[in-house]
Regions:
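MPN/JAMM (Mov34/JAB) isopeptidase/deubiquitinase module and associated MPN-bearing subunits/adaptors
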Residues: 1-100, 104-192
């Protein structure tokens, strides 16, 4: 097994700004609604505070790599180098730290894979810049939201009937582990 890098010590839960959660769900929906349902992939940006808290502030779609219903593949070094270059450009533009990647798992034949696949684990282990990996699960379901399980973020979109579940994984000394995630409320009430 490859050594796991980088190991960044931080305190759970990983905090998500509401805006970033909306971006993640919107990007997952975009892939879900394409012909043949495709996974989406992108980068996460934010901050690591002085008290070792990770705050996700932005999620940015990355169109590189070969996307399919069950994965995103970066086959060659040229593609990988373009992704690294794009991460650096966005880090500079947003003036935030690159924290990791996200991708979606879409419903196929009424089922959605709700874990970190072996390919996901290998990709995460070999990405020496990312210290978290976030998965957005999306499926069409009943007209009521699912309950949140410990440490996950759950969303429901009444207009479309889509359900979302967001899980975060981190590189730890004892391997890749799921860590708790939580939304930071903005305190703003929107009245329609």
């Amino acid at each position: 097994m490859a050594s796991i890098h980088p190991l960044i010590e931080f305190r759970a839960p990983v905090l998500f700004e509401e805006f970033a959660v909306r971006e993640l769900c919107g990007l997952a929906r975009k892939g879900y609604e394409t012909r043949f349902k495709r996974e989406t992939f992108g980068f996460l940006f934010g901050t690591l505070t002085t008290d070792r808290r990770v705050i996700i502030r932005r999620a940015c779609y990355y169109r590189g790599g070969e996307k399919s219903r069950t994965g995103i593949i970066f086959k060659d070094w040229a593609t990988i180098k373009r992704a690294i270059r794009r991460r650096r450009e966005l880090t500079s533009r947003f003036r935030m730290r690159f924290l990791g990647n996200f991708h979606s798992h879409v419903e196929i034949a009424g089922e959605v894979f709700k874990g970190l696949s072996q390919e996901d684990r290998e990709s995460f282990i070999h990405d020496r810049m990312a210290f978290i990996e976030t998965i957005v699960f999306i499926w069409s379901g009943p007209s009521k939201p699912n309950r949140s399980t410990s440490g996950t973020i759950v969303g429901f979109e009444p207009r479309t009937g889509y359900n979302y579940r967001i899980r975060v994984y981190a590189k730890r000394k004892n391997g890749i582990r799921q860590v708790r995630a939580k939304v930071i409320p903005t305190g703003v009430v929107v009245i329609y």
